[in-house]
Amino acid sequence: MRIAIGADHGGFELKNKIFDYLSKLEDIEVSDFGTYSTDAVDYPDIAFMVSIEVAKGNYDYGILIDGIGIGSAMAAGKVKGILPATCNNVTTSKAAREHDNANVLVMGSGIVGLLLAKEIVNNFIRTPFGGGRHERRINKILKFEDANNKVEIEKFSEKPKKILTKDDVLYAIRNGGGVVYIDKNAIITPLAKEFADEKKVRIIKR
């Protein structure tokens, strides 16, 4: 099972702990889409990155964490094919999968603690879709989505911002480069900036 996880600055710490938890499960492959510090970022950028990867079929599920769990769900729901669910208890996490076939779980770090978050995540990813009458209802949602021209992946006009991390700088050094080229709208984490300055690596936006 492949899972994409991401958070804004409000969900950064809980996201890291959930990432570590999932990384230790043998049947799970998890990828971290940022953010990588507590510096303020815009939750739609992270939500779009994770949701697009899930919609493309590159990941089975997405997990998004912000302060309350509402904004990221709103953003994720704008990506065609994404059925996000804000779940701040175990009951809703089970129902989101069994009844609604949700493929992106959203949580609020200001609402749930680590132990509850682990339970929510585990129930979400382990609960199969019930199908039957539930499938009929979900199909109505998807049909309405198609008819009303929601944002499609291939037509996504604003590319999500790249987040430059220390690992990106290290990769450049290992490949003999003293320069890292990034998009003009990219986010540079403080650790990446400090590391680049220390190693005399230039970061050029273009």
Tell me the role of every PLM-derived stretch.
Residues R2-L14, T91-I153:
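C-terminal binding/interaction regions
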Residues D39-F48:
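Structural motif
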Residues Y59-D60, N101, G177:
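Short, high-confidence coil segments that cap the C-terminus of an alpha-helix
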Residues I82-N89, K200-R206:
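Short hydrophobic/aromatic-enriched beta-strand-loop microsegments
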Residues V50-T86:
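Helix-adjacent hinge/juxtasegments
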Residues E29-A40:
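A short beta-strand-loop structural module common to alpha/beta enzyme folds
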Residues K118-E119, K143-R206:
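Intrinsic disorder
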Residues E13-K24:
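Short, solvent-exposed amphipathic alpha-helices that sit
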